[in-house]
Amino acid sequence: ELVTRRGIRTLSPRHSEYKGVYEGSQTDRDLAYYNGCCLTSLLGPYCEVCFKMKGAAFLNKAQWLVNGFYEDLNKHGVGAFSELYDGDPPHEPHGAISSALSTAALLEVEYLKNKYKEE
């Protein structure tokens, strides 16, 4: 329930404090950031652990995770990956429109996919 096509949610949708949409005042957005938004930057460490545990059996899931981002390249910041996404579908992009952390995480997942394809 934490893993989405746009990153890892910061809180479960089942939790009473969950905020699935990043909107409103600065306080509302800050609450959503830590209570439900999807952070792309967490995908790198998540996939690294999954590959270590499951090996090549995780390849399809890793591919599923990154495919959604390529669809998003022309949506929020042309040719860039956003900092965060709504926790609720359709996971609209928010925050920095060209996030180095998000880009690094996706590059790490691509690297891991290639590494485990070769093994």
What do these predicted ranges mean?
Residues 37-48, 60, 64-67, 104:
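Feature representing long, continuous alpha-helical segments
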Residues 1-38, 67-119:
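Extended glycan-interaction surfaces of carbohydrate-active proteins
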Residues 50-64, 111-119:
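Structural helix-adjacent loops and short alpha-helical linkers that scaffold large soluble proteins
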